[in-house]
Amino acid sequence: WIMGHMVNAIYQIDEFVNLGANSIETDVSFDDNANPEYTYHGIPCDCGRSCLKWENYNDFLKGLRSATTPGNSKYQSKLILVVFDLKTGSLYDNQASEAGKKLAKNLLKHYWNNGNNGGRAYIVLSIPDLNHYPLIKGFTDTLKQEGHPELLEKVGYDFSGNDAIGDVAKAYKKAGVSGHVWQSDGITNCLLRGLSRVKDAVANRDSGKGYINKVYYWTVDKRATTRDALDAGVDGVMTNYPDVIADVMNEAAYKNKVRLATYEDSPWVTFRK
C-alpha cells in the first residue's frame, strides 16, 4: 500500500492517486463537542508541504465517496484504503467515546450513504493516544445500533503514538479489538528515525501470536528509506511522494518481491510468504 500523506483537500485525492498512491491518509480535527469538524493538519507539518489545506469533514467524505464508488464519474479504482488520522489531542479523555459515535454517524451518512452503494474503500481509524481507546467502542457500537454491523468489515484500527508494542496490545484488549489491526511507526520527514520498532512490529505480525495484521512506516520520501522499509517487510509506506515509492518498487531488487495492493487484497489478513 502506497499511502499518500496529508490528503486534506478534495482535489488532492486525484493528485495523489495519479502519482501512484492506492491509499490516502487524511487528518480529522474535532470541535469542542467531539464532532469531526475539518480535514485539517495545521502548523507544523512535514517539511516541504503546505500544512493549511482543509475541507469541512462531511464535504471531504462526499468527495471521497465519489472517488471510491464504481460508476461515479470521479471514480478512482486504485484507491482502496483510507487512513483517518484522528486529531483527538484536542479532546478530553472522557470525550473519546463520543468522538467515536459521531465519527460513525458521519461516515455512515456521508461516506457509506446509509449502506446504500456508498464508497467501497477500507477505512483505518488511527488514534494517537492509547487512553482514547473508548473511541473504538463508541464507533463500533454506533454502527451496530444504526443497523449496519456489516460495515465494520470495512474498518480497521491503528494506534499511532509509537508506544511500546505491549502497551498497544493492552489498549486493544480493553477496546475489545482482535483483528483488522494496522501498526504504524514513524516520524515527520523533517527528522530521522531508525527501524527498530518497525522490526518489532513486523516480528509481532509474523509470529502468528501477535495482535498486528499489517505494518506501515511514515513519512518516507527518499529512495534509500523506501528500500530500508521494504527490506524490513512493511505492508505500507506513507509518503509525500507516491511516485518515488512506485519507482523503487519497480527496481530489479523489488519488482518480483512486492506489488501494489488491489481491492481484492484484504487489508486485514496478514500476508504469508
Curated annotation (Swiss-Prot):
The keyword Lipid metabolism applies. Binds 1 Mg(2+) ion per subunit. Transmembrane segments: none annotated. InterPro entries: PLC-like_Pdiesterase_TIM-brl. It is found in: Secreted. The active site is at H5, H41. Its EC number is 4.6.1.-. One of its GO terms (cellular component) is extracellular region. Disulfide bonds join C45-C51, C47-C190. It catalyses: an N-(acyl)-sphingosylphosphocholine = an N-(acyl)-sphingosyl-1,3-cyclic phosphate + choline; an N-(acyl)-sphingosylphosphoethanolamine = an N-(acyl)-sphingosyl-1,3-cyclic phosphate + ethanolamine; a 1-acyl-sn-glycero-3-phosphocholine = a 1-acyl-sn-glycero-2,3-cyclic phosphate + choline; a 1-acyl-sn-glycero-3-phosphoethanolamine = a 1-acyl-sn-glycero-2,3-cyclic phosphate + ethanolamine. Mg(2+) binds at E25, D27, D85. Its cofactor is Mg(2+). CDD domains: GDPD_like_SMaseD_PLD. One of its GO terms (biological process) is lipid catabolic process. The keyword Transmembrane helix does not apply. Keywords: Cytolysis, Dermonecrotic toxin, Disulfide bond, Hemolysis, Lipid degradation, Lipid metabolism, Lyase, Magnesium, Metal-binding, Secreted, Toxin. One of its GO terms (molecular function) is toxin activity. Gene3D superfamilies: Phosphatidylinositol (PI) phosphodiesterase (3.20.20.190). It holds the Pfam family GDPD_2. SUPFAM superfamilies: PLC-like phosphodiesterases. Dermonecrotic toxins cleave the phosphodiester linkage between the phosphate and headgroup of certain phospholipids (sphingolipid and lysolipid substrates), forming an alcohol (often choline) and a cyclic phosphate. This toxin acts on sphingomyelin (SM). It may also act on ceramide phosphoethanolamine (CPE), lysophosphatidylcholine (LPC) and lysophosphatidylethanolamine (LPE), but not on lysophosphatidylserine (LPS), and lysophosphatidylglycerol (LPG). It acts by transphosphatidylation, releasing exclusively cyclic phosphate products as second products. Belongs to the arthropod phospholipase D family. Class II subfamily. This is Dermonecrotic toxin LhSicTox-alphaIA2biv.
